[in-house]
Design a protein with these regions (language model features):
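Active-site/ligand-binding neighborhood in enzyme catalytic cores
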Residues: 2-99, 106-107, 128, 138, ...
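Central helical "cap/lid" subdomain
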Residues: 98-107, 114-174, 235
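Conserved flavin/dinucleotide-binding core of flavoenzymes
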Residues: 109, 156, 172-312
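Non-transmembrane alpha-helical segments in soluble domains
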Residues: 21, 25, 83-87, 101, ...
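Aromatic-acidic/polar surface patches that form glycan- and anion
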Residues: 9, 13, 71-79, 118, ...
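Intrinsic-disorder/low-complexity, polar/charged segments enriched in Ser/Thr/Lys/Arg/Asp/Glu/Gln
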Residues: 54-63, 119, 157-159, 199
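A short alpha-helix-loop-beta-strand transition element characteristic
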Residues: 30-38, 167-173, 237
Length: 312
């Protein structure tokens, strides 16, 4: 039903939106198939809360980003190098380790208070934080706007990053990546450029993260590692466990990306991207055309133009 890129949150379409669970059942899918479809769902923590229109949006985006005329490109040594390079072009360095506790404004300026007690004055502020982190900052938002920050779900993701010294999967005729219906979710392996080693990432999605998120870091890492060795015993001798990342437990994130419940985006999306006086909002949750890093950059351009219009 999405004939235009930005139509996914159109109120008329949102009025007929439903959960992926309801949609699949209406189409006659058996429960066993629905359970399988819901495994490793990246677009909702469970199918009952997954917007069917959001899935159409994802399909449309994949269509725009693929095709014979489009080349697949990667950032050398990881995606983080891209924002680092952008930061390197700024006139002033990015200040790290300075959490913001409050943003207040008058008719002529904004005042940003840091955890250290330092206060910054500016003509305008662009807030790009994920909504769970934004909730922790005192901004004197209208009550309805402040309440909305806590009403949008964020995707639960746990990642265990490992280093593999040798491609153990080749002897078994495997391809090196796995899609499972077990605790492990999905497993991705990628060669490390210039070496014979591989990065391996265990990627667990949605409500399957709940039982792991209540464990301490050591117990969580051990639980995932044991499941990994049980699935692929040959991996144990050549695989070292590196970093555990639990997005929902990170106070500066609260989850991997924003999720829209059925029908929610019709009103919530435009409300969250609207400026509040001299405070402007960006981040992937405010983007219209794209998701992820592309959406974050799209939203940054939009917010910058909004500030320029204010200050013109």
């Amino acid at each position: 039903p999405l004939l235009k890129t930005r139509a996914w949150h159109d109120p008329a379409l949102m009025a007929t939106d439903q959960s992926a669970l309801s949609g699949l059942r209406a189409l006659g899918f058996p429960e066993t198939a629905i359970t399988l479809i819901g495994t490793n769902n990246s677009y909702g923590n469970n199918l009952a809360d997954t917007s069917l229109m959001s899935l159409y949006r994802v399909m449309g985006e994949f269509g725009r980003l693929s095709g014979p005329a489009l080349a697949v490109r990667e950032a050398t040594q990881g995606n983080m190098r891209l924002p680092e390079a952008m930061a390197g072009q700024l006139a002033r360095p990015v200040e790290m380790g300075e959490p913001v506790t409050a943003v207040h404004q008058s008719s002529s300026e904004t005042r940003v208070t840091l955890a250290s007690g330092k206060v910054l004055n500016a003509d305008a502020v662009i807030m790009t934080l994920p909504l769970p982190a934004l909730q922790q900052i005192d901004m004197d938002l209208p009550r309805a706007r402040a309440n909305l920050l806590g009403e949008v779900d964020y995707h639960k993701v746990i990642q265990l990053h490992c280093i593999v010294e040798a491609p153990f999967w080749e002897n078994a005729g495997w391809g090196g990546s796995w899609w499972t219906d077990s605790l492990l979710g999905r497993i991705f392996t990628r060669p490390i450029p210039g070496t014979a080693r591989y990065n391996m990432t265990v990627w667990i999605n949605g409500d399957d993260c709940d039982e792991l998120n209540i464990l301490n870091e050591t117990a969580c890492t051990d639980t995932i590692s044991r499941a990994l060795w049980d699935l692929m015993p040959d991996a144990r001798e050549v695989t070292s466990v590196g970093q555990l990342v639990r997005w929902s437990n990170d106070p500066h994130a609260g989850g991997a990306w924003a999720l829209w419940r059925p029908g929610q985006a019709a009103t919530a999306h435009p409300a969250l991207r609207a400026p509040a006086g001299r405070v402007f909002f960006a981040g992937e949750h405010t983007a219209e055309s794209y998701r992820g890093m592309e959406g974050a950059m799209e939203s940054g351009e939009r917010a910058a133009l909004e500030v320029m219009r204010l200050l013109a």
